[in-house]
Amino acid sequence: MVRNLRSSEPQKISRFPRHHGEGKKASSPALNLQWPGQKQVASAVAPEMRKRAPPKNNNTSIHRNCRKHLRKEGDWWIVEGGQNHKKAAHSPLKTKPVNKEGNRKKYGRPPREVEGKWLTSLIAATTEAVLRQLGKGKSPTAHTKSNQSRVPLQHSEKTAKGIKYATPQPKKKAHEQRKELPHWPPTKRSHGANKGQGAPVRAPAKTQGKGEEQPHTMRTWAQVAAPKKQKVTSKPPMAQKKKAQGEKKGAAANPFHWELQVEQLLKDAEQIRESMYIRFLHVRQSWWSTCFKAHMEFHCPVCGFAHPEETITVTHCRQQHPGGPPDSLHPDNNRESGAVSQVPPAHFRRWWLSSHIWRKRKISTLLSPKLPVPEQGDYPNARSGIGTGAPHSPHHCDRSAGPP
């Protein structure tokens, strides 16, 4: 920091400086580095340009020699030179005491040690003042006591004459005031607020940060429907088992619940089996009533069925034996024909069950390759082979009887 040694009084600067007395030698002319009308500024580089004009009246005015030098020592700027104030000889003036270091003045910032102590003391004093204000229940920017005691009431409590102020409350203790301190700094009063009244209390501004938002407690439907995730811990299985034993009784799975489910499934399977057997009996009953006639008489002596697809076979048989005995089967004959022996009775039972479960198969696709058209010589054998009782296959049940 450089000291500005600007002269306090304006002076005339000419090309040739004035003499301060007779017998004195005139100094060499100095360069005029200023514009006309500009004040002269002192400089540590050109001290000869800082000479002041002599006083107008030769009285007790002081003649000063302003030849001073400016140098820097570390963090200090030191100005040296110059003389003390002197008066005329007839009235001596008491001189001022000189500093121990001589006529030297220091400018600039103090040393680092002193600066550190000064900052520490300043911080400590400020902290102490703030804590003292907080202890009294006031913030550093709070209003005065007179303004705090005159708190205006709500708009509904204002009277016609003017504002009705609340009565000042008695002072509370220090620990009670600390509990009532706000968690946010008080807002500054606006410029348009009335100075005689306290500023209105404002709510703190809402921050936009995510950390300040309050989490909602309601769950979404996706969270409700989602299954609970099992907690995966790093503890050994024995420790988890001990922890599970100490839980509530309702937390463990009920084994009787699963046993009840199994019994229910078995019951359903049994009902399905019974219903299927009942359907089987209904189909067999309708087949018997359709195919059987009194005295063991059937439509066809070869197959014994009355199906529309077998009309060709029946017509062929009757054409081959126009004058033969009526188409009747007798159970007292155990002989089998070659055509019927290809399909044993057990196979007929399987076809009968499968055809009435799916209701998709037809007798033409099952029996046509296995039962060839009977010839004239095979007719007696066919009658005796089928005459073992009731037929063993329900493929040619009457469609008019309806579903079982």
From Swiss-Prot:
Biased composition, class Basic and acidic residues, residue ranges: 98-111, 395-404
Keywords from the named record: DNA-binding, Metal-binding, Transposable element, Zinc, Zinc-finger
Bias-annotated ranges (Polar residues): 1-11, 29-41, 141-151
Single annotated GO MF: zinc ion binding
Annotated zinc fingers (C2H2-type), start-end: 300-321
Chain intervals for the UniProt region annotation (Disordered): 1-62, 86-111, 134-251, 317-341, 369-404
Name under which the protein is recorded: Retrotransposable element SLACS 45 kDa protein
Species annotation: Trypanosoma brucei gambiense
